[in-house]
Amino acid sequence: RMRRLEAELGTALLVRNTRSVVLTTAGAALAESAPPALAALDRAWDTARSAAAGELGTLRIGYSLSVGAETAPALVDRLIRGNSGLEVGAVPMATPEISPAVADGRIDAGITRGEQPGRGVRRFLLRRARIGVQLAQHHPLAEHPEIEIADAAAYPLRLPDREANPVIHDQLSALFRDSRPHPRFHTPAVSFDMSQRDLRDGVTLAPAGEAAVMAQPAGLTWRPLRGAPSLTIHLVLPREQSPLHRRIRAVAKTLAHELHWLPD
């Protein structure tokens, strides 16, 4: 091997005789520079392996504002802590825009409330949550551990603007479709009021998933609706996935299992 290397370099690296082998000037230079070069090569291989495993790069996530209380922060935190080579950024987006943004590459992944339509993407169930209502602690129905849908329908019901999330709006309004008398729905003037001041009248109810408890202002509470179906949260990825996308999927799947987001 040494003679082949000398032939390729066109110079002797060793002086050989019957008693000893001594490095030439070229051989000494090679011996001095080889360890750093090999270490750099090892680092290059490690970097390539990390990239192939989806552990390097910039990750852009768009999420529905309503999953910003718990689900999106938990996934982003796990991605950051478990992958030091990833630069992760997450921003709220209008829910109907998330799947198209993933499909055309403006963002790498999305987290949506409800299974949103869209071409060129794959949707993975990330979380199931009970549907209930937010209400003032002094509301007459707050004394019940669970609320009947028919009982809730007797009060004014606040729903988000349908344009913000048609899938969820239609799912929530459908809960009360068969209620008599017909429920009184209204859309708030302020689309996202963190104080939830309209619920403090002790009359109005706001259908919401149980994750709403995580960002609930003082004076309000949440109660499940008996017999209501689950509200779902989905991870949205491109149909054609890179190692980075497969990494996101694996981390999300592990997190959902650990936090019991998907009951057996």
Label each PLM-derived region with a short phrase.
Residues 4-25:
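A short LG(V/I)-centered, amphipathic sequence patch enriched
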